[in-house]
Regions:
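Extreme N-terminal starter segment of soluble prokaryotic enzymes
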Residues: 2-7, 183
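Structural alpha-helical scaffold elements that stabilize or flank donor/cofactor-binding regions
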Residues: 38-39, 72
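N-terminal beta1-alpha1 ligand-phosphate binding loop
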Residues: 6-27, 190-191
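An anion/phosphate-binding loop that grips the pyrophosphate of nucleotide cofactors and donors
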Residues: 42
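Amide-donor transfer/coupling interface in amidating biosynthetic enzymes
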Residues: 74, 112-209
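Cysteine-nucleophile active-site neighborhood
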Residues: 50-127
Length: 209
């Protein structure tokens, strides 16, 4: 099988090289770019994200990413969000929200609000188990593994049509991963999650056509 061509979206997000290297290690042909044609023609698009929700959205808008993502999804072309790249797929985030305001607007691919974790220690930084649903394509062959998280905010719910993998930190049960046709995302960092993360990326590559 020919190597799958994957674009990791370049919009100023930090530490994207680790995602590029992780994808290359599992056999992908990877390009780091925001070129419209490259994004449209790639077998898969990865949207990484670290830092503040609003800053990630500003970066995405600066390269026209919302339109590029919408076009890919309309054509059934796979997209994978990572960390804040998952959060921005929801309607909005409570991060930096003040009284009387709605918070930062996201891409609204999935309805819902990203909220601060309720836990004795925030951020959630380290390895945690997850609970994938039966039949998950991302977690095929992966059982009882831990994945690496670094975040202070998370989605606590998702629309019924989204297949959700759950995790827990403190008092908060949150969306650790989500699968919805061509659109998938992880709150954890698969590129920093060792063999289990590599297997998940390999599974995602296997869904690309």
């Amino acid at each position: 099988m020919n190597a799958r061509r994957v674009v990791v979206l370049e919009y100023g997000s930090g530490n994207v090289r680790s995602a590029v290297r992780a994808l290359e290690r599992v056999g992908a042909e990877v390009e780091l770019t925001a070129d419209v044609t490259a994004v449209a023609e790639a077998d898969g698009l990865v949207v990484p994200g670290v830092g503040a929700f609003a800053a990630v959205m500003d970066g995405l808008r600066s390269v026209g990413a919302p339109r590029m993502i919408d076009r890919r999804l309309a054509g059934g072309r796979p997209v994978l969000g990572i960390c804040v790249g998952l959060q921005v797929l929801f309607t909005s985030s409570a991060e930096h929200r003040t009284e009387g305001e709605d918070g930062s607007a996201g891409l609204d691919e999935w309805s819902g609000v990203v909220e601060r974790l309720e836990a004795p220690v925030v951020p959630h930084m380290g390895w945690s188990t997850v609970e994938p649903p039966a039949g998950s394509a991302l977690f095929a062959g992966i059982e009882d593994e831990r994945f690496y998280f670094v975040h202070s905010y998370a989605a606590r719910s998702a629309p019924d049509f989204v297949s959700v993998t759950w995790s827990q930190h403190g008092h908060t049960r949150f969306v650790a991963a989500a699968e919805n046709g061509p659109l998938c995302a992880t709150q954890f960092h698969p590129e920093k999650s060792g063999d289990a993360g590599a297997e998940l990326l390999r599974n995602w590559l296997g869904t690309l056509s």
